[in-house]
């Protein structure tokens, strides 16, 4: 297989396309679409988002020290795109996209809301990374199975890659499935 050499760039794709909600001390609220996001640490639970300093939400997050990562779905694709290309300086994104906010600016329509408190801001270049501790997680009960397990694969999650939004959802394995013995797999499925 032949490969081309490209200039250095971020090729870690696909990425989650999340809607980050925040507010300032004056009561203004905004939603920002972010693809530069992920897990930093398990214990304590920490995440990050990277935002350009010129974005309207940047100073809200910097001032309040808080934000909410709202996972997006295929049903939220249009709103996710809108909140990434329109500025909260010019338009009320909540109103324009017919979105509902609950406490702490959590997006009601999102299957998962991850409430975060900023611990550190790393000024890296074009984007500044907000390192944050997770203070609460809300999960939509509609996606809980009979055992109370959250079935994220049924939410129709949205991903982003090179300017395109992609739907996710098909489960192809579970953690450790590649090394489990066949007898363990049969037992788990209820076969002997």
Segments and roles (model prediction):
Residues 1-192:
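Basic, polyanion-binding surface patches
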